[in-house]
Amino acid sequence: MNNKIFLNIASYRDPLLQYTINNVIARAKYPENLVFGICWQYGQEENSSLDFQGLENRVIKVPAFQSKGCSWARNLSFQLHKDEDFFWLIDSHMDFADNWDESLIEQYHQTEDEKAILS
């Protein structure tokens, strides 16, 4: 296990998406283990580019007028997951605690259940 974390986000025109990406990276103890999978539904007047600070990312960009809803976007972003050790579904407007990645992995191991779900 290499502790790769797939962060799944479905975002519909959320102006805080880039903030969340920056925050999740800045507060991670091991940002090099982060992989982003995002369905970014952007408005015509919005910048569709995102900055991942050189980290691995898989992004599906959809003009907002072509969106078919939240579940549809989640389904698209789920398909971006490959062989990462952890899959975490997050919102596009979140703040993270310092070393959040290390803390959640520790919590997972404390369960002693390889199929544990943390919420």
Q: Which residues are covered by each model-predicted region?
A:
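Catalytic cores of eukaryotic secretory-pathway lumenal/extracellular enzymes that build
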Residues: 2-119
